[in-house]
Swiss-Prot record:
Task performed by this protein: Protein S19 forms a complex with S13 that binds strongly to the 16S ribosomal RNA.
GO cellular component terms listed in the entry, alphabetical order: cytoplasm; small ribosomal subunit
Protein encoded by which gene: rpsS
Protein name: Small ribosomal subunit protein uS19
Classification via Pfam families: Ribosomal_S19 (PF00203)
């Protein structure tokens, strides 16, 4: 169920402060964050975030198409190595 429109998008307070500081200083350094749950706002376009995926920080450059999505959507947490090979077919060869 989506978030109520009257509440507005959720963005962590500490992340808002970092974004405002970066925009006011026109600072283009990477903003490190653990806040995967924060929604991407229009003010964040053009900034680069280092989003934590549980193991390391993934760099995410924000574009206009990302506005309205969550930061965590762009830093995958699971690694897919492929399905296990069929042992029977390998043994016959």
């Amino acid at each position: 169920m989506p978030r109520s429109l009257k509440k507005g998008p959720f963005i962590d307070d500490h992340l808002i402060k970092k974004v405002e500081l970066a925009v006011s200083n026109s600072d283009r350094r990477v903003i490190k964050t653990w806040s995967r749950r924060s929604t991407i706002a229009p003010e964040m376009v053009g900034l680069t975030f280092a989003v934590h995926n549980g193991k390391k920080f993934i760099p995410v450059f924000v574009t206009e198409n990302m506005v309205g999505h969550k930061l965590g959507e762009f830093a995958p947490t699971r690694t897919f190595y492929g399905h296990a090979a069929d042992k029977k077919s390998k043994a016959k060869k």
